[in-house]
Amino acid sequence: MKIKRLDISNYRSLDGLSFSFHSEVNFIVGLNNIGKSNLLKLLNTLVNKRNFIDEDFNDIEKSIEIKITLFLDEDEIGVFEDLFDPTNERQINIIALQENPDVNITFIHAETETVISSSLIKKLNFIYYDSLRKPSNELNFNTKTGSGRFLSHLIDLYTKNDEKVQPEDLINNTYLAGLLDYINSKLELIETFEANDIKADTGNEIKEILSRLIILKNDENFPVDKLGYGIQFSNLVPISILERIFNIKRRKKTFENAIITDGNGTVTLPITLGLDEPEIHLHPHLQRKLSFTHLKVPFSHSNIFIIS
């Protein structure tokens, strides 16, 4: 399932504009403040959010209306049941309509005005990576937000079946006890620490301890947060994709809505990746390499293909 065309009405600076997309890779080029980021934010809202907010309305007195033309792969015909473009059964025209900021987006088949479930739009699985995200904040095992959730999940998977392991099994208690005594002897001199009885101690959870012990390094022993932004960014993108799969897979109904199964039983999970201002992190060669590296990634153990 791919977005073939957008016709936009009353959305930010893109009011009255239309965009046609290539089936594989698209590059949005233009002057500063011309609306490139707005296009990615529009796609993110359509797929991942329930409604547009006040600042999305070019004219607050008018509704936002987006005509979305989707092109379906052969195996996806029938996803929208008997709704399709009368001139092409592999194409469907959908109107995304929101009358004001206080209501949700409604999706309607353009030709018949039949309401379409937003869960079908979510099958596009759009991943939006804006230019303000800092890769080093997510490429670690000690974060519960963003793409770092996937890395922390790897620790969860390993430890959940090994309940016998205790924190003291991982740490030299004699050395640690001396360290804690030393730290607390200094902290107790701080009046607020002393008044609130706050002291340094070890974590009680194995996962908590391990997530602080493990870091990502290269073969020259440099931590990933000390490497160049290009390396951090290019490694964060596949982690972002895997985090999205993990997030979808953990909710059975969401996963069933997201995947597409053909007649041979092959399961497909479409992914659309939107990178805002990749030139901040990547030189042109790495941008091209990244764009084509993630077109198709096989997971042989589950027969899932990620297609962006």
Map each language-model feature to its residues.
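Conserved P-loop NTP-binding catalytic core
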Residues: 40-87
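Beta-strand secondary-structure signal
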Residues: 5-7, 18, 65-69, 93-95, ...
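Solvent-exposed residues in well-ordered beta-strands and their adjoining turns
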Residues: 9, 22, 69-73, 132
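Short polybasic amphipathic segments
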Residues: 66-68, 102-109, 212-217
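Extended helical coiled-coil dimerization/tether regions that scaffold
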Residues: 138-144, 148-275, 284
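Glycine-rich phosphate-binding loops of NTPases
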Residues: 54-56, 74-170
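Residues at beta-strand starts and edge strands
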Residues: 2, 15, 62-66, 90-92, ...
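Switch/communication elements of ASCE P-loop NTPase nucleotide-binding domains
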Residues: 1-48, 221-308
